[in-house]
Amino acid sequence: MVEGSPELVQAQIKSARYYAAPDVALKDVELSIRPGEFVVITGPAASGKSTLCYCLTGVIPHSISAELDGEVFVAGRRLRDLRLAEVAPLLGFVLQAPENQLFSLSVREDVSFGPENLCLPIDDIQRRVMASLAFTGMTEYLERGSDQLSGGEAQRVVLSCLLALDAPLLVLDQPAAELDPEGRRHVYQNLHRLNREGKTIVVVEDRLGDVAGFASRIILMQSGSVVRDEPIRAFFARSDLDTFGIRIPDTVLLHHYLQERGVNSRVVPLTVEEVVEGLARDTPTPTLPLRGSEIGAETPHPPLPGKGGGESDDPLSGRETAAPLIEISHLSFSYPNGARALDDVSLSCRAGEFVAIIGENGAGKTTLAKHLIGLLPPPPGTVVVAGKDVSQLSVARASRLVGYLFQDPDYQIFNGSVFDEVAFGLRARKVPKDQVEEETMAALGRSKLDHLRNEHPYTLSRGQRQRLALASTWVLRPPILLVDEPSTGLDHREAADLMGLLEEFRAGGGTVLIITHDLELVFEYAQRVVVMRRGTIRLDLPTARVQEHFDEVSAAGVHLPQFMHLVAALALPPATNDVPAIGEAVLAGLRR
């Protein structure tokens, strides 16, 4: 590497090791990034993605104690030789949790902070503040307290702070991981605009469908090393994508499904529009209809026998006769500031159901959950769980009926070892010592944590801590598990592991309710979907029928999975509820 290179970023890292860790976090990483690129860094958990971001931004070695054997240049300048104040004009860095970067009393002060420290004239500072807030659509929040922002709003303010510095490079570590679909859309729309206007973007992202349409390149990491570094279409053209442990866009999965069955396309489609255009262009049947109902005509598609069920074997068919385990009747609630959170909500759930509660931020989902566990005492008679009126129960008693998993598992982990964390509830209930040992180890084994029994919980990965929180709840044998955003912060495999445990709990007779924005998980695991909007329940139906209500679900602020947009674009029957079914429908249309 030499100063004056045309690359904006050059990195040659032999190793990076945190002083408290026995193993290296990065090894043998070499990469360069040219001006104007949009680069996505992806990979499974603990693959070194965040550590690479720290090195590319100078956080390592300047702010985080780590041993770096290697060099990183940005704009021809060696980061090791610069003070952090000298790094700021070169690049901006967005952390996964935006609240960690906001510390002033108002949005105006937060966005002004960077330009003020560059000692710019007051007029220039004000111009930059207003221009950056206008770009992210946050002008009306100028005097809003930073502690009064939603997650999506806070992330847009952090982006505004970086824009006010006018650095040529932006590095973002999972910038939308904790946002709802609308918040994710806003973040990536803004990043796409910035890239079109000349900024170089480097973003860590696991949900590649969010960025596939405009990213130029993908860097795949595993075990601290870069194992793939390719243009995005070349990467998605690979036949071994399923071995990488990452989420693959449905458009790409469909491409490979058809290719394996003899339907070849010149390019891998990255968007729904490209799928439609590619089929029209590359298939041997020029009259193949792609936007009319003809492609699905005379091609029966019975509901697939997946976890979501269907009309012929409706998993909810016994709801009218089975006694409800949860009965919510005409529940309304307003917060002290007058905000109406719930408005005449009624809902019942039977034993053995797997129910997903979805909706945009502010729809009332979490408020409803808090009433189920007694954190917000409901009016008498409105919430009944297992025959008990929740308004008459203490939180401790309610927790025996409903086990609650927070979105952030660290809020409910407080013991010094993995074993003690799971055993805590049993000991509190005066369970005999031998039984505590037996049941705790069974729970740890089920959660694939038994080999970590003596480890401190905070040495575990986010996915392991999520499974630990579930194990400590499940071991108490509540009839109901209520899980808030089970996939937040998890990679594809970690999310699948956690959802597999929840499905195992349900299969054993338990009832599972999840609050989520991840519609891919909903379609794979949930039997039933409850759609909330503005404090009311707008839809309550089997998962397999959600496609029939495409417009209503979209209007509720829920970002639908890519395969649902494919079904709509190709005018397939609503029961076509996964990529293989879409592929078979397309093949049937081609054969006619």
Model-derived segments and spans:
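Helix-to-loop junction immediately C-terminal to a conserved catalytic motif
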Residues: T57, I373
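Conserved ABC transporter NBD signature motif
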Residues: S65-R77, G381-D389, A398
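Conserved ABC ATPase "signature" region
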Residues: D123-Y141, D434-L452
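Conserved ABC ATPase signature
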Residues: G145-L149, E153, H456-L460
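Catalytic Walker B motif of ABC-type/P-loop ATPase nucleotide-binding domains
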Residues: L170-D173, L481-D484
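H-loop/switch region of ABC-family ATPase nucleotide-binding domains
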Residues: E205-D206, T516-H517
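Conserved ABC ATPase "signature" C-loop
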Residues: S223-G224, R534-G535
